[in-house]
Amino acid sequence: MANQATTTYKVTGTQKAVSNLWNTLQRMEVNSRNIWLDDLAKHYGIDYQKKHICVRGHIYWAEYEEDEDTSLLSFETETAWDACNDLFFEINRLLDDELSISYRCCECGCEVYYTHDEDDYFPEECCVSASGEPFEDCCDDVYGTIGEAIREWTSKTGIEQGERTDEQMMDFINEYEYEDDDTYFYIRTFTFE
């Protein structure tokens, strides 16, 4: 079974192009059911096999916002191993390259954490994967700074940062051995494309 990547997308562009994608998702009943990416590719007439575009996954949430200046479509996908960005790039090509696509991908199993941000939608520096006591049940949360993630860990464990730099402390936390083998707290920094 593949590891699951969760990717958050922020899509802007011309009102016509953004509305096209949003209206398509609405017709496919987004927010009522999962929208499988192969179905989305077929809707746009994309031969994903011929083009070697991965479509293993689905959109599980979307929302559209519009004001006088901006059309913004936000949605999240769950996909196998990595984000399926090539599908959305191909949809953009079909919509006359009128979309600006920003995204943040988190896949903790293979430690894939990256951001492509064409505006300022994803300023966060890192993602924390944590489970077990004294942390909550398995969760992945983004943090604005590595320092914020470190403070979260020190507040839960009672272990102080002391003279360690943030980099040294992050290494200390990532290598820390807990009494229970199922407990972990990993700070993973985003790569910015």
Task: Kindly label every feature range from the protein language model.
Residues 1-193:
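Intrinsic low-complexity, intrinsically disordered or marginally ordered coil/linker segments
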